[in-house]
A protein has these predicted regions:
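Helix-breaking motifs and short loop linkers at transmembrane-helix boundaries and internal kinks
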Residues: 36, 68, 89-95, 106, ...
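Conserved MFS/SLC helix-loop-helix module at the cytosolic interface between two early adjacent transmembrane helices
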Residues: 55-93
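Paired small-residue
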Residues: 79, 83-86, 94-102, 293-301
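Cytoplasmic helix-loop-helix junction between adjacent transmembrane helices
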Residues: 93, 99-140
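C-terminal membrane-cytosol helix-exit motif in multi-pass small-molecule transporters
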Residues: 166-185
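Juxtamembrane intracellular "pre-TM" segments in multi-pass secondary transporters
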Residues: 181-208
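C-terminal transmembrane helical hairpin of 12-TM major facilitator-type secondary transporters
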Residues: 269-313
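A late C-terminal transmembrane helix in Major Facilitator Superfamily
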Residues: 314, 318-352, 357-360
Length: 374
């Protein structure tokens, strides 16, 4: 008999990686000033974060199949908490970068193991609906992160942010010790070479990988570049934090719209097409309006597109790999997080939010059209 985890706990664990990333974004300006580095160097910590996150997804995904879901989750949370503690105490920028990489490696467990546990416990239409609920949770996580990050940065700078992250990780670790069940029924023999070859030859996997990566780059490039855009427009880090409320509302509306349309029987293909159109409109709007605070209005369309697209892509991506859910999730996660890291690295160099948004939107449209031709 399957032991199903609490949906509430799963929502929190899937939200946590996004919360801890966006809570850090308002502190980028403070980090640049405190360590006397450029904004471009400070922004690159986000690219490093996602690259290390990709490695973590692979390691924790493989360990989830080998050790089990529960112990893997606990070890990952422990690694994250200790890394946040190191980042809080150092006075060297290179150590901050290393601690950020290790923290990303650790918290990747919240993404890959949570998704694996959901795929263990649910299937078919039920799994799609559960991921819809997850999407609603994910939609509010940037709001929480940005608001907390803005206030904490104003209160005590980046060190207060990292201390808060440590406390949050410790609290989740203790809660999971008592409440997280094991969902793996039996361990499956793993032929990693065979699995990797199969996935790399699967066009559906590549399409899903590109869509997840591009929608995330569109979203997180705002958290990467937005703090500097706000400063250039004369706004503070706390005011940048408040902007997360606006964008979180957009993602929340997108997630609710996704849930409503799924309930009305709309197909995944039609929902992805709607998301693609919203992203195109939002991307061009951001490009045209980015010299004023009104660029937040088209950014709403971008985050709405994210809220619609991501639950649909994630729920369907690994339907043919259920017997090796952890390892397949690890490979899938590695693929899209490496692309996210590379994309945000380019975004940090370009330092133009509008150009990044248009590039993501056009590419998403092409991938969506190729997916519809199947």
């Amino acid at each position: 008999m399957k032991t199903k985890p609490s949906i509430g706990l799963m929502v929190v664990m899937l939200m946590f990686p996004q919360i801890v990333e966006t809570i850090y974004s308002p502190a980028l300006g403070d980090i640049a000033q405190s360590f006397s580095v450029t904004y471009t160097q400070a922004a690159q910590t986000l690219s490093i974060y996602f690259t290390a996150f990709a490695i973590g997804v692979v390691v924790w995904g493989l360990l989830a199949d080998k050790w089990g879901r529960r112990p893997t989750m606990l070890v990952g949370l422990l690694v994250y908490g200790l890394s946040a503690l190191v980042a809080m105490q150092t006075d060297r920028f290179d150590v901050v970068m290393l601690a950020r990489a290790l923290s990303a490696f650790g918290i990747a467990v919240g993404s890959v193991v949570t998704q694996t546990m959901l795929r263990d416990s649910f299937s078919g239409e039920e799994l799609g609906k559960v991921f819809g609920v997850m999407g609603i949770g994910i939609s509010v996580s940037p709001v929480i992160g940005m608001l907390l990050g803005g206030q904490l940065t104003a209160l005590g700078g980046y060190q207060t942010v990292f201390f808060t992250l440590f406390v949050m990780a410790l609290g989740l670790f203790v809660y999971n010790v008592f409440k997280l069940p094991e969902t793996q029924i039996q361990k499956q023999p793993l032929n990693m070479g065979s699995l990797l070859g199969r996935m790399l030859r699967d066009a559906q996997i590549w399409q899903s990988t590109l869509l997840v990566a591009l929608y995330n780059i569109a979203l997180f490039s705002y958290y990467q570049l937005g703090a500097f855009t706000f400063e250039a427009l004369g706004f503070s880090s706390s005011e940048f934090g408040y902007s997360g409320v606006v964008l979180g509302l957009g993602t929340f509306v997108g997630s609710l719209l996704n849930k409503f349309l799924l309930g009305k029987g709309r197909t995944q293909t039609s929902l992805l097409w709607i998301a693609s159109i919203l992203l195109l409109a939002g991307g061009f709007g951001v490009f045209w309006a980015q010299t004023s605070i009104w660029f937040l209005v088209p950014m709403l369309l971008v985050v709405m597109a994210f809220g619609i697209a991501i639950p649909n892509v994630l729920s369907a991506a690994l339907v043919d790999y259920k017997q090796q859910a952890g390892s397949a999730g690890a490979v899938f996660g590695l693929m899209y997080y490496l692309l996210i890291g590379a994309g945000l690295g380019l975004a940090g160099i370009i330092q133009n939010l509008g150009v990044v948004q248009i590039s993501c939107a056009v590419t998403v449209s092409l991938v969506t059209m190729s997916r519809m031709k199947k």
